[in-house]
């Protein structure tokens, strides 16, 4: 979500369409460093252990913008090893690392920390160590477009604090194994805040303890696997109200934490859209993936983020995206963008997580597309496809959607609108809405609470659609040019072929004779093939460019 918000923020500043601004500011060839590799590469010093449990215990000194605490790492060894890597930004101090009650030697390189054990940890062994740390965390200049802490005022003279760290990584504020491929199985999050304030984090509140130093500790337990950037603190003088939804897996708790002055507005806005969203997404994607942890919306001083079971909300109770329809069709103003989009990530992003940041299209393309599925559930398929088509004006084709692997880099912001249009095309090609819904639900079942690769997702869709879509995905995800359908009319016959980067590109496309019904043709790259459509002539030849994001060229 951060990339989309970044694009939209710059657009707001320059009063032009967001994705165009992104191209102008960020276009260029990037060079990667040793620090990028340490952050993005799953080296043997990271793959040697499988993280099972964290207990993050942190105290937030708001006045001094200072944090201190510890994180317990409980893990299982996947191989024999005596050294491992965890991650913590170098502006934060590692006070000590303890193993069996004794300090461990450690060294730091950029934002990586390496520890040496006194003996070999054997494969299959379960062990734990604790990292004690402190410091002034990075303060985000404009969260969630950049990562870190947000220290704000709630408008009533009280502090309002939040974290947001997608892409830059959770190690910007707490020590962890900061690689998307390894999600912790469960986690206890203990947050001490000044008396009179509340911390609202992921999962369920287990305990509130008044300490003797002017602080109150809130213990939140997350019972499901969670990606590191999905772990969040939200601190304010929150007011709470709740509801329930009887969904596909029974009763789901709905909890809302908002600023006091916004309670009435929140009751209306959340009441209008949350249950509608959950009903639509359970229909399309299957049961909400985190029933045991519940569903929360938490008002934040930044726009929003898909923090698992605790969605950050900052859309100011307006329809659309802060009052705007990103598709310019009108359909985007019939719902709250942050509620729908960020909650869509509970299925694609939190339930299914990409192993590498390079494959973030798995999160963002599907969640962009989820917006249209929400529209379809309530307003019909035509409205949904109009919305998808309307988002095309945001496509830049500036760089590939899939980024280089192993350097913690995400690809083009086109993963939102171009990715959504790609998925709509795949659906049209499958030409079986029941099957398409089965595929979407099946993805969330087959990869339930898992980290995945692009290959796994594409292979699943191809297998269940009974059509190999690998070349279609490759063209749209790995190249900046879109395929062009070239056609010609000669001696009373129509001919067509694809011009594409991918050799053997073989996407079916819908065409028709004006006034007739659409039919699929199956052009290839290379030589022209005959288009067998009775009565077709240059003056009545039409291609379904409403649903197919392609170029057209007459020879």
Located regions from the model:
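Amphipathic alpha-helical substructures
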Residues: 289, 412-494
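Acidic/His/Gly-enriched intrinsically disordered linker/tail segments
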Residues: 223, 360, 364-425, 447
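A surface-exposed beta-strand-loop module
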Residues: 25, 84, 89-152, 213-214, ...
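Hydrophobic helix-coil surface modules that form long, contiguous segments used
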Residues: 69, 165-166, 177-340
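Beta-strand-rich binding/interaction modules
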Residues: 93-99, 200, 469-470, 489-546
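Surface-exposed beta-strand/loop patches in extracellular or lumenal glycoproteins
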Residues: 70-91, 175-179, 184-194, 455, ...
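N-terminal, polar/Ser/Thr-rich
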Residues: 22-68, 152-159, 179-181, 470-471
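Glycine/proline-rich low-complexity spacer/linker segments in large multi-domain proteins
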Residues: 35, 39, 44, 132-187, ...
């Amino acid at each position: 979500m951060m990339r989309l918000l970044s694009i939209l923020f710059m657009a707001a500043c320059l009063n032009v369409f967001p994705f165009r601004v992104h191209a102008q500011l960020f276009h260029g060839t990037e060079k990667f460093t040793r620090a990028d590799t340490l952050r993005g590469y799953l080296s043997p010093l990271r793959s040697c252990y499988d993280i099972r449990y964290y207990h993050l215990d942190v105290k937030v000194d708001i006045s001094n913008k200072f944090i201190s605490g510890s994180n317990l790492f409980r893990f299982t060894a996947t191989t024999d090893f005596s050294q491992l890597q965890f991650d913590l930004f170098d502006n934060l101090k590692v006070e000590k690392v303890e193993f069996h009650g004794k300090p461990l030697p450690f060294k730091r390189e950029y934002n990586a920390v390496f520890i040496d054990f006194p003996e070999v940890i054997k494969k299959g062994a379960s062990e734990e160590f604790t990292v004690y740390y402190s410091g002034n965390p990075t303060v985000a200049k404009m969260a969630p477009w950049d990562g870190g802490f947000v220290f704000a005022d709630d408008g009533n003279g009280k502090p309002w604090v939040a974290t947001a760290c997608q892409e830059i990584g959770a190690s910007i504020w707490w020590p962890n194994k900061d690689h998307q491929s390894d999600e912790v199985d469960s986690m206890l999050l203990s947050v001490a805040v000044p008396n009179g304030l509340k911390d609202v984090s992921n999962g369920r509140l287990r305990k509130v303890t008044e300490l003797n130093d002017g602080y109150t500790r809130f213990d939140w337990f997350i019972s499901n696997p969670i990606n590191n950037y999905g772990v969040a603190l939200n601190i304010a003088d929150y007011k709470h109200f709740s509801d329930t939804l009887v969904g596909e897996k029974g009763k789901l708790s709905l909890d809302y934490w908002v600023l006091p002055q916004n309670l009435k507005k929140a009751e209306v806005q959340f009441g209008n859209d949350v249950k509608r969203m959950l009903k639509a997404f359970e229909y399309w994607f299957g049961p909400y993936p985190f029933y045991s942890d519940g569903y929360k919306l938490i008002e934040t001083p930044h726009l929003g983020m898909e923090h698992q079971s605790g969605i950050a909300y900052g859309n100011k109770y307006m329809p659309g995206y802060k009052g705007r329809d990103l598709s310019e069709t009108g359909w985007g103003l019939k719902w709250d963008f942050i509620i729908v989009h960020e909650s869509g990530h509970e299925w694609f992003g939190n339930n299914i997580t990409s192993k590498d940041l390079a494959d973030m299209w798995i999160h963002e393309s599907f969640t962009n597309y989820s917006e249209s599925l929400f529209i379809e559930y309530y307003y019909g398929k035509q409205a949904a496809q109009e919305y998808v088509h309307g988002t095309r004006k945001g496509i830049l084709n500036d760089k590939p959607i899939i980024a280089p692997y192993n350097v913690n880099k995400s690809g083009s912001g086109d993963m939102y609108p171009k990715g959504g249009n790609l998925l709509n095309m795949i659906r049209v090609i499958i030409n079986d809405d029941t099957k398409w819904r089965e595929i979407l639900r099946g993805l969330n079942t087959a990869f339930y609470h898992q980290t995945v690769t692009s290959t796994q997702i594409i292979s699943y869709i191809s297998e269940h659609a009974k059509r190999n879509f690998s070349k279609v995905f490759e063209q749209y995800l790995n190249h900046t040019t879109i395929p062009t359908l070239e056609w010609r009319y000669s001696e009373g016959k129509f001919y067509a072929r694809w011009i594409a980067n991918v050799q053997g590109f073989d996407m079916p496309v819908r065409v028709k004779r004006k006034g007739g019904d659409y039919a699929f043709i199956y052009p290839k790259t290379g030589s022209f093939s005959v288009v067998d459509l009775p009565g077709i002539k240059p003056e009545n030849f039409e291609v379904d460019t409403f649903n197919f994001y392609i170029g057209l060229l007459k020879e």
